Amino acid sequence: MHNFVPTSIQLKPPFYAVDWQEVADNISSKTKMIIINSPHNPSGMLFSKDDMLELQDLAEKNDLLVLSDEVYEHIIFDGNVHQSASKFEALAERSFVTASFGKTFHNTGWKMGYCAAPEKLMKEFQKVHQFVVFCVNHPIQKALATYLKDKNHYWKLSDFYQQKRDFFLHLMEGSNFKIVPSKGTYFQMLDFTEISNENDIAFAEWLTKEHKIATIPTSVFNEGRKDFKQIRVCFAKTDETLAEAAKILREL
């Protein structure tokens, strides 16, 4: 849109931390916006308070807008706290925060979410949004508005998914995969460098065809298809499915 050209900052394993100096070095007079995603898909990384302060500093110094993708905001583990762009006063003034009812309430097929921003930004947002989204299901909007009144419907999500993550990681103990536990989302990265020399796409295809386990090769998320020999698995499954998958993966 408007002939914008994205500049990507490659997050690197095992922890996928943001190199803020690299971000600063890539900002030019043409830069208009920084886009972030936390909790991060596919890595499960979280932006810390220090990360958000670094972002706020860069955005203020360079007069940049921020698009903060926070669709996994309620799926965070190990006592960590979600650092929303809306929590930082100077950052909130220049940020669009997007979130997803689909991710929060297990109904991704409904394609329902929201964007929050200061009024002056939302007026500009709406000029574009009206040509991108034709309509949404109004009865479902009403239902979700009612459902949101009970905070227990989303405040308990972290515990629910952490049990899934911990269950899966416990079953994966002793495997040949290198694993850094996910800090958020319902995804877990698995490093297969000790198992295969194949690229991640070939390895994922082999897992699907030979072992009936569907994963995502993480190079498809990267600019230039950078291959770190990692796959992404989803642990938002029944315990029986996770146990069966872990048994197969442990034997590789």
Predicted feature residues:
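Conserved glycine-rich beta-strand-loop-beta hairpin in the small C-terminal domain of fold type I
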Residues: Q141, A145, Y161-L169, I179-F192, ...
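Substrate-binding/gating loop at the entrance of the active-site cleft, primarily
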Residues: M1-P6
